[in-house]
Amino acid sequence: MSTDRELRKGSAETLILALLEERDRHGYEIAKLIEQRSNGVLTFHAASLYPLLYRMEARKLIQGRWVEKAGQRRKRHYSITAIGKRVLAERRSGWNTFIDALVRVAGLNHA
């Protein structure tokens, strides 16, 4: 079954914020973790991920900084901000309410 694009799009910011709540990460790591943790159901390509990260940074949900390591090219690492943490808490609450409603109405199994 393919996952609806709009559902994926609507959850992307929440997924990114949740991963950054754990620790700072760079874009490629974020994309790979989303793919791994979703067992390949959710994938984000650079063409869509990086513009989203830039928009989230402009809205002060996350903060980026360049990190350089000897012998490697520099990478932009992102961290969640206080605003991002508040938004994540609100989104989690909203998703929980939404999922509970789907379970009740459509008879879905919720892990």
Region annotations inferred by a language model:
Residues M1-S2, A111:
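Intrinsically disordered, low-complexity and often Lys/Arg-enriched segments
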Residues S2-E6, W66-V67:
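Short beta-strand/turn micro-motifs at beta-sheet edges
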Residues D4-S48:
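N-terminal helix-turn-helix DNA-binding core of bacterial DNA-binding proteins
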Residues A18, K32, Y54, A89, ...:
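A cross-family signal for key residues in well-ordered alpha-helices
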Residues L49-M56:
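Basic amphipathic alpha-helical segments that dock to polyanions
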Residues E57-R74, S79:
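Beta-hairpin "wing" of winged helix-turn-helix
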Residues I80-G84:
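Accessory beta->alpha helical hairpin/"wing" motif in late/C-terminal subdomains of nucleic-acid enzymes
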Residues K85-A111:
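Amphipathic alpha-helical dimerization/coiled-coil segments
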